[in-house]
Amino acid sequence: MSKRTLASLTAADLEGKRVLVRVDFNVPLDGNGKITDDTRIRAALPTIRYLSESGAKVILVSHFGRPKGKPVESMRLTPVAERLSELLGRPVVKTTDAVGAGAEAQVAATSNGQVVLLENVRFHAEEEANDAEFAKALASLADIYVNDAFGAAHRAHAPTAGVTEYLSPCVAGYLLEKELQYLQAAIDNPQRPLAAIVGGSKVSSKIGVIETLLDKCDKLLIGGGMIFTFYKAQGLSVGGSLVEEDKLDLARSLMAKAQEKGVQLLLPVDVVVADKFAPDANAKTVAIDAIPDGWMGLDIGPESVKQFEGALADCRSVIWNGPMGVFEFDQFAVGTEAIARSLAGLTRKGATTIIGGGDSVAAVEKVGVASEMSHISTGGGASLELLEGKVLPGVAALDDAA
């Protein structure tokens, strides 16, 4: 990675310094305001601990939910501060606002090694607008900047890009460094064969990724609702399945590009169809050329799972982005869960397995094999953009490595 990292800063560089750390604590809450998944908080712990143990004053900044530029009581970061305190085993001070006199006073009262969590930065509309004055106000709280929020690195917002104009050094935290190393290496210098598994409901949201991967990978396995656009493009009847009619030509061109590049492009050979989009729908497995009228495909079938597992068996690197079916409904989660277990098995045999954010992460966690993957990305949109070969503004804004 060509960016300067936290590892380049010693305790002597950090002691007594105010360090602003952009983290991604946008975690899910249940109806009672309890955190249901603290993965993103845990992912930032190595950076927070290193700074704290080095005697820095650690000032964390995160967004949470979509409060649309004004304070919303249910989107305060109080539950996050409480969970972080538990994980660190020490109190975390939460400010009443992200900027302003109150935040300044609370930061000024901070002692070396203490951790402060600024209130939800999205209570200010200026945050997403990357407003210079707002970025300056945030930066005034600190001396050094660390970006450890891969999930927000694809946004040119004040806490990811704007503050870097006013602070020095600006470095990548341990989580951001790991994300970039794994994802960049998977694209630029993978162990081969490299397989990419792309799922999800729409081709349109994955066009850039599929096109880039066709230039990089040896095998491309496609699942999820987007398969029906490919089937229809081949003249097959897809019943009531989801199809993007305006993407049929695109699907044909992607299949042609795969052939031209010598990439093995695999589409499922059978699907699980349902008579309605519901967890209790009637369901049956059919070949892809036998989908009944009015029935919709909601998962890949057992023969497709075998086909995909066979294709993956000799792969040394696998990138997975997007589920194989509607895995929120248990009876249509079988394909996704089988692929998750298959990747865990490949990791045990020495392959590098990368789960590229979003629903695929939820899937491997649901199956209980998250810890068996080589790397789980914390960023959905950011990992997609990096896999597409785009420059992430939050990364570009950091200091270059010496």
From Swiss-Prot:
One of its GO terms (biological process) is glycolytic process. GO terms for molecular function: ADP binding; ATP binding; phosphoglycerate kinase activity. The keyword Transferase applies. Pathway: Carbohydrate degradation; glycolysis; pyruvate from D-glyceraldehyde 3-phosphate: step 2/5. Keywords: ATP-binding, Cytoplasm, Glycolysis, Kinase, Nucleotide-binding, Transferase. Its EC number is 2.7.2.3. It is found in: Cytoplasm. Substrate binds at residues 24-26, 40, 63-66, 122, 155. ATP binds at residues 206, 297, 328, 357-360. InterPro entries: Phosphoglycerate_kinase, Phosphoglycerate_kinase_CS, Phosphoglycerate_kinase_N, Phosphoglycerate_kinase_sf. It catalyses: (2R)-3-phosphoglycerate + ATP = (2R)-3-phospho-glyceroyl phosphate + ADP. GO terms for cellular component: cytosol. It holds the Pfam family PGK. The keyword Transcription does not apply. It comes from the Bacteria. Its main location: cytoplasm. Monomer. Belongs to the phosphoglycerate kinase family. This is Phosphoglycerate kinase. The gene is pgk.
